[in-house]
Amino acid sequence: MASVGSTGNVAQGAFSAPCLLRSLGYVGVRSRSLDDWSEFAVGLLGMEQVERATPSRAFRMDDLSQRLFVDGAGEEGLGVLGWEVATRADLEALAALLDAHSVAVAWGSKALADERHVAELLVFHDPVGTRLEVFHTPEVADRPFKPGRPITGFRTGPMGMGHAVMHVETVDAALPFYRGLLGFHVSDYSLDPLHIYFFHLNERHHSFALVGSGRKGLHHFMVELGALDDVGQGYDLAQMQADRLAYTLGRHSNDYMTSFYAKTPSGFFVEYGWGGRIIDPATWQPHETFDGPSFWGHERLYLPDKERARLREARLDAAARGVRAPMEVNCPWLESVKRNA
């Protein structure tokens, strides 16, 4: 099997593989601002910090041993996205598929698996250089999750950690890889003013997205809370910190998430949300969207005035046309009834 490094080409539309991936399992960040990350993840997001002997930080969100980790070495930014599959057989099938399409892939060492708190994993890169790890059997912690501040908890389970959104120079450079080779399912997409594709792996409206912004790197990752008040109280905290807020409170038009975005110590954003849309992957039909990214709010405080005005106009236009959607209530019992109906 090839070593980790190069990535082969997969022609758009030439191949479509079944998706073995189930959810976003973890996010790894590279940053020298470890103390700042601890304050951010624990004090604002409400994660639990886990003690580590190495110069790094790790954080819990649920019953698993870790969901977010920050490595103190390397260039500032995203280190890795970790995706979960069900079994070792799924890893073997994925490794064979990647190898057959000339994508360099390697099995992670036992030491790396222990560091990630998973049974086994594969390591490879997407066409734009993003490090991806795919694993099975994450380690369950031996004690309950203890949030860093009073929150009801995070919405994870079968839907995973949340979602990740990546900048790419052009969507065409990565779409064949994610949709064709890895089998990510398109939820919806927008072609104006930027090409943006949203993908699902489970009942969460999207676990991944590509934004053709002409840039590279992580735009944001999202964590979903168990109660709207968790988000509102986090919003209060974010507004008290200088230059922390990136997007004001608002509601997205495709996944119905009520959220705000906070700037991380590494420069990208975290979306902190509640009420995300639940879909039925078996019947969902991908479609183009035309109503702009948000029903209301989500003023992008970091953008130039001209760009903010354009997005504001899109929101006002959608409101004038009566575009809206019912709230999605986070109720495990109701979700189980929907699944079994």
Where are these regions (language model features)?
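Conserved donor-binding loop and adjoining core beta-sheet/short helix segment
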Residues: 51-55, 61-86, 109-111
